[in-house]
Amino acid sequence: MSTNTDYAALALRVSSGALFIAHGLMKVFVFTIPGTVGYFESLGLPGFLAYLTIAAEVAGGLALILGVATRAVALALIPVLLGAVWVHSGNGWSFSNEGGGWEFPLFWAVIQAAIALLGSGAYALKPSAP
């Protein structure tokens, strides 16, 4: 029998997973892979990190939605989000600022920590151990 906590974990897991997939696919289809690699390099980061970021966002988002290795995936996505905090740190706090501030990626990192603590919740393909 599922509890309210299980359904809360499900809501966080699925909504967060959908956002990760959307952001990963945006890097592929809107910014393009070469554009994303170029952007990473313009920040002084190695270009291969763009590929790792895209893979983490798409695969991690799918794993969250399906409820597979939920705790590990949520924890693994936190460094990606902290990298986004760093990227957006020069734009100020508010995400509505030009270039996007760092409030959204920081909040999203906190959500991943909550998902890691809660586990997969209801309707997971591979439920987390309590």
Task: Kindly label every feature range from the protein language model.
Residues M1-F29, G47-A55, A59-P130:
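Extended, low-polarity transmembrane helix blocks
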Residues F29-G44:
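Membrane-interface interhelical connector segments
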